[in-house]
């Protein structure tokens, strides 16, 4: 005998997302958000792929004031969540993952500081010039703008990622702790 669901949501009550799936989905969504800022709010000429996509479309800023710093938040939190989803390393590794991605973002932000940018751009290996996208590396440092708010947003992104990771573990939906 076939049973009939009592409500539209009843068939889905057994659906449980694993922590790695939650982290992966949120990470991908945050990556899309950060990418969306670059594609929708920034000039195409600023993009590393500008030479590959010959467009001259100009749109009004969709993300407004937040558009300047939102990628720092989105990318740090996305990469931390994606890394935590792939490694599933336990409570001891998760803060290291978040701090690691924060450190990468802060290093690139500091590299745009006027006192450091020229030195770093000159230190880029010569072979980068022959690799699409990598050939833009010196311009990233020379044309970029150092912004303390980017560091603040990146810090908020790392903290947010850590809270998401810790929360999925605290709710008992994570496998046993595989500490270092």
Show which residues each predicted segment covers.
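Bulky hydrophobic segments
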Residues: 1-180
